[in-house]
Amino acid sequence: METSLETLWSQVLERLQLQLSRPTFETWIKTANAEQLDENRLVIRTPNPFARNWLQKYYVKTIRDVVHEILGHPVEIQIEIAQGDSNATISAPEVASPPPTASPVENTNTSQRQQASLNPKYVFSRYVVGPNNRMAHAACLAVAESPGREFNPLFLCGGVGLGKTHLMQAIGHYRLEISPNSRIFYISTEQFTNDLIAAIRKDGMQKFREHYRAVDVMLVDDIQFIEGKEYTQEEFFHTFNTLHEAGKQVVLASDRPPSQIPRLQERLCSRFSMGLIADIQPPDLETRMAILQKKAEYENIRLPREVIEYIASSYTSNIRELEGALIRAVAYISISGLPMNVENIAPVLNPPTAKISASPESIINAVADTYGISIDDLKGNSRRREISMARQIGMYLMRQHTDLSLPKIGEEFGGKDHTTVMYSCDKVSDLQKKNPELAQSLRQLGDRIKLANQP
């Protein structure tokens, strides 16, 4: 039986969504389209050259294997740029390669770096790349090489201590290596607001505007703190427009995407979203170990592997805590004179409580009890609105609080298909962003589930 292009691509998307992380799927796969299917060739089109190069470099083999599995015979995967973008010239950088320039610490143009408020340690060569940050790292390299062209603005979002500031400042260092006379400006949103207030008090708005709009690359940290500040938003809107229209690069960092920043003017939200939004997730175990190893190398510290594994396994939420634990361990060993091993450092580290992996039964019981629904109904096929919604919430919570795959979650709910689980998780995730009551209910259920699963 011949498979149509639409059917094939739908099946490919379903399988890739199971294999890849959600940020990867949403950013690189979901934005692509299958355009043509011949006997031995599938043509896939991407929205821009960066996406094309990224798919070609990292995911073409995965796509080829999935298509082969569906069709029953091998096909060539050809990735092209969608019509209208064929003249674009930016290509993806080598992600794992540091910039081919001298270390900023050893460079002589110190005054420019000080004026730009750049930390000498925040360079690309000291940034550890893993699955959690590969897209953001590659996008920052692309911006550093060709500012104001492909991703403008570039919006980095991720939790506290995940490396957003490091990447932003690495862009500044890179530009100053290539072009020492570049005007690089790294600021926090708080600094922008304080400077604006001072300018208003001193009748210095003209000087303020000249200062902030005469830059080549503007790097703005913690942009989420602009929320609710109407006059700051007004001034930043015009500053952003002036820079963007002049082809100057703007890079923004936040702990959440633009659409989730409360009391943000719609026009600013639109502008923040019109470039690339690159998400940074907490690092996995291997990346955390690599971060510790690199930190130890730069500080000329010898660490046994078991110590690296212990610290990396104990601190999972962010890089600042991870590096802070390493510093405490090294300081204690240095002062005490004891050998560096897990037994000696464990008492002084006091790692945070490990994330509790919940049992599926505890989640089902909590949801059934909260919504007054029997477990049989929750696992059944009833389409009654209140039962269906509770079932979707249960699937979402099981996705959040267990390591079960989508098919396994489906089995826990009476043998539901993995696509049903996928739809349910996406629906609840979207609804909670618009419904504060649902978000609060999910938090309370999450706390209840954690309490029920404590040892």
Curated annotation (Swiss-Prot):
SUPFAM superfamilies reported in the protein's UniProt record: P-loop containing nucleoside triphosphate hydrolases, TrpR-like
Subcellular localization, as worded in the UniProt entry: Cytoplasm
Binding annotation for ATP: G161, G163, K164, T165
This protein's record includes keyword tRNA-binding: no
Ranges of Polar residues composition bias in the record: 104-116
Membrane-spanning residues: none
Region Domain IV, binds dsDNA, annotated ranges: 334-455
Organism domain of life: Bacteria
GO biological process annotation, one example: DNA replication initiation
Region named Domain II: 73-116
UniProt-listed Gene3D superfamilies: 1.10.1750.10, 1.10.8.60, 3.30.300.180, P-loop containing nucleotide triphosphate hydrolases
Disordered: annotated segments: 92-116
CC per GO annotation: cytoplasm; plasma membrane
Domain III, AAA+ region: region residues: 117-333
Record GO terms (molecular function): ATP binding; ATP hydrolysis activity; DNA replication origin binding; lipid binding
Region (Domain I, interacts with DnaA modulators): 1-73
Keyword field: ATP-binding, Cytoplasm, DNA replication, DNA-binding, Lipid-binding, Nucleotide-binding
Family, as annotated: Belongs to the DnaA family.
Record function comment: Plays an essential role in the initiation and regulation of chromosomal replication. ATP-DnaA binds to the origin of replication (oriC) to initiate formation of the DNA replication initiation complex once per cell cycle. Binds the DnaA box (a 9 base pair repeat at the origin) and separates the double-stranded (ds)DNA. Forms a right-handed helical filament on oriC DNA; dsDNA binds to the exterior of the filament while single-stranded (ss)DNA is stabiized in the filament's interior.
Swiss-Prot/TrEMBL domain comment: Domain I is involved in oligomerization and binding regulators, domain II is flexibile and of varying length in different bacteria, domain III forms the AAA+ region, while domain IV binds dsDNA.
Record text on subunit structure and interactions: Oligomerizes as a right-handed, spiral filament on DNA at oriC.
Protein name per UniProt: Chromosomal replication initiator protein DnaA
